[in-house]
Amino acid sequence: MANTATQTALKVADEVWIAAALLHRERPEAADFAVEEIVERAKREGLHKPLRRGVYVHVIQHSVANRPPNPGRYRMLFETGPGRRRLFRRGDSYHPEREGAKITPELDDLPHGYDVLISWYRDWCSAAAGNALNEDPLLALRGSGKRLWADEHADDYVRRLREGWE
């Protein structure tokens, strides 16, 4: 899919986003990827030959939303754990100095054939937002304590706890 005519115009951050998006699309069961996997996917895609050294730095720092900007302010990736990344989604936490920063490549900046990744990304984010409601750990606790109160009314419990207080 590589388009060498546009390789010099392609921003490193956009190349990193493309690599991460392709990994997510190829392996939808994976929640995140090792830094090395994203770098290797960018290399394999061959959007810029040879692979620019900046790709690694963007995956580690410049494009990672929840890390302090240094100097890149992009919000294209999200650090899920040490050495692990996934694409950033609206609603993810991010460093305050990255407010308003770029999340996806501009459609016109993508090499021919990669524009489909933008619509795929929107669908991926929508599906993840729906799943987040079902998987929220706090919401999962709803009703978990009802057995504790099954044989005693809450008011009676509080009254019993306060017996002997002065």
Q: How should each PLM-predicted stretch be described?
A:
Residues 31:
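Flexible coil/turn residues that form the inter-helical turn or adjacent wing/linker of helix-turn-helix
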Residues 148-159:
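Short linear motifs in low-complexity, proline-biased tails and propeptides
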